[in-house]
């Protein structure tokens, strides 16, 4: 069953997961949300034995239903690879009865690497699926770690202003 996404402002505007990924926002400025929240078909105990990549696939396949298994696994493998300084990607540690999930092992050392590492792979796969031939151009203006984390996966050309702490143009 394919999950359908609709606008938060107008339920008549719908899209597949790949279309929603490419559009980003709905035409009325809303966000794409799924018509229903799928159940995860993995027992909680089994999740503790799975790698980050396996968990990512188990979750994403329920939401990105127009992607094939091969497409999703390829996106995940390319996103969560040697860019992270540990094969665990997001290690879980226990100390004094509390658990800590380390989300800083990505290329920019920001928790945003977790989500933004896969975005370019999902976008290029979605573009192929929807016969989009144009290049994907991401323009961001930021002074924080979100922009850096987003650009890391897309970096073919990065422009930094002269006021930036790290002045450079990278092509």
Task: Give the positions of each predicted feature.
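Single conserved hydrophobic/aromatic residue that forms the stacking wall/gate
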Residues: 160-171
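Small-residue-rich anion-binding loops in enzyme active sites
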Residues: 31-109
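Gly/Ser/Thr-rich beta-alpha loop segments that engage phosphate groups in nucleotides
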Residues: 26, 31, 146-149
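Well-ordered mid-protein domain cores that form the structural environment of catalytic cofactors
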Residues: 99-156
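Structural motif
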Residues: 30-31, 98-99, 136-137, 162
């Amino acid at each position: 069953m394919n999950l359908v996404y609709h606008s938060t402002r107008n339920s008549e505007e719908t899209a597949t997961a790949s279309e929603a990924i490419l559009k980003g926002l709905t035409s009325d400025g809303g966000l794409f949300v799924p018509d229903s929240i799928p159940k995860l078909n993995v027992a909680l105990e089994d999740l503790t034995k799975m790698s980050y990549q396996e968990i990512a696939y188990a979750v994403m396949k329920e939401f990105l239903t127009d992607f094939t298994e091969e497409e999703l696994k390829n996106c995940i493998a390319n996103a969560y690879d040697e860019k992270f300084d540990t094969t665990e990607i997001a290690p879980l540690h226990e100390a004094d009865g509390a658990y800590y999930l380390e989300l800083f092992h990505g290329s920019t050392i920001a928790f945003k690497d977790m989500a933004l590492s896969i975005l370019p792979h999902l976008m290029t796969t979605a573009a192929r699926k929807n016969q989009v031939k144009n290049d994907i151009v991401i323009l961001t203006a930021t002074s924080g770690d979100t922009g850096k984390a987003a650009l890391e996966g897309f970096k073919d050309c990065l422009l930094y202003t002269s006021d930036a702490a790290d002045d450079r143009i990278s092509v």
